[in-house]
A protein has these predicted regions:
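Internal, well-ordered alpha/beta segment that forms a basic, Gly-enriched binding/recognition surface
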Residues: 72-86, 108, 114-115, 123-124
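Mobile active-site "lid"/loop adjacent to the S-adenosyl-L-methionine
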Residues: 82-104
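Flexible, glycine-/basic-rich loop-and-beta segments that form/coincide
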Residues: 165-221
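Conserved acidic residues
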Residues: 17, 70, 121, 166-170
Length: 318
């Protein structure tokens, strides 16, 4: 919570704004001294306004006038265990309505879209970094991204909130405007490791191989591979498969070397910083092809390659 307000106050004099948290839970984001702050939730035990933020969202529901300067804050619930304020939403039998234009596969994306309807001047909330950096997720944000742009951010580890699998969360500050995916790829995200992350700084394996089942695209098949999503998924999943399956990625001879690269990337994946977890598998294609024979045969050559690939980031290589 402190980091959220530190980020917000760097850009905004918040004293002149009403603060609203539409899924306030234990009111963690409303504990600061402030002249006007409003909390709401669907849980009657919260002691806040009992309002469903995802059904017919409008300012008057919260007693906020149309011309009132407004900032939305908080940690809205999303589809994992790290939404620490609203974990109860998964534990209790809450049944609540969601407007059709707000519905999404992820509850957090529904909340972001609901914020846009309330037209605050700023939005400063925690949510998974994957909402922004995964293009498929970003496209789901249309109602939100067409009216707000990312102004500032800090990437933090989910370990700050939970002991479950680690992944990157972003404390994100948005202002009125619009953004596209190219803006996100250019954005330099500061991290809690004292480093930065920029998608455009890297090349990705998806530019060279198929990540998902591709039976119709591959004729002569020399092997099979487990479907891929991101680096965190690679840590959990297999690489090469001993037998074909309907969901397997088929490997052609000319692409085999890249799947071997992915196999070895899996070995070092736990040693790179958590904030790479939702990215596609990273590669420096020119550098890799230059040493490909040594890379496949010599562990030391692979280690030197990966050290250069992640230079400037706190890795745990031997």
């Amino acid at each position: 919570m402190d980091c959220t307000y530190k980020l917000l106050k760097k850009h905004v004099g918040i004293e002149n704004y009403t603060l609203l948290d539409t899924a306030c839970g234990n009111k963690e984001f409303l504990k600061l001294h402030h002249p006007k702050k409003i909390g709401a939730d669907i849980d009657p035990e919260c002691g806040a306004l009992m309002i469903n933020a995802l059904a017919n969202p409008k300012r008057e529901n919260y007693g906020i006038s149309q011309d009132e300067p407004l900032i939305i804050v908080g940690n809205p619930p999303y589809n994992d265990r790290t939404s620490f304020i609203k974990q109860d939403i998964k534990n209790k039998d809450f049944i609540f309505e969601i407007d059709n234009d707000l519905k999404s596969r992820d509850l957090g994306i529904s909340f972001l879209k609901s914020f846009a309807i309330l037209k605050p001047a700023f939005i400063c909330v925690l949510h998974p970094l994957s909402y922004l950096i995964k293009e498929a997720n970003f496209k789901q944000l249309k109602l939100f991204k067409d009216h707000y742009r990312l102004l500032d951010a800090l990437v933090v580890s989910s370990k700050s909130f939970t002991k479950s699998n680690e992944f990157p969360i972003v404390i994100a500050l948005y202002e009125r405007g619009r953004m596209d995916y190219a803006d996100i790829k250019r954005f330099i995200f500061p991290t809690d490791c004292g480093t930065t992350l920029c998608l455009n700084d890297f090349d990705y394996i998806a530019n060279y191989v198929d990540k998902y089942p591709n039976a119709k695209k591959v004729g002569a098949c020399v092997g099979y591979f487990f479907p891929m999503r991101d680096i965190n998924a690679l840590k959990r999943n297999k690489t090469f498969l001993n037998a074909p399956s309907e969901n397997a990625v088929r490997i052609s001879q000319d692409k085999l070397i890249y799947y071997q690269y992915i196999h070895y990337f899996k070995e070092i994946a736990p040693k790179i910083p958590y904030y790479f977890g939702n990215l596609d598998i990273i590669i420096d294609n020119f550098a890799f092809l230059k040493i490909k024979d040594a890379f496949l045969k010599d562990k030391r050559a692979r280690l030197e390659y990966f050290k250069k690939l992640f230079q400037g980031h706190p890795c745990e290589f031997d």
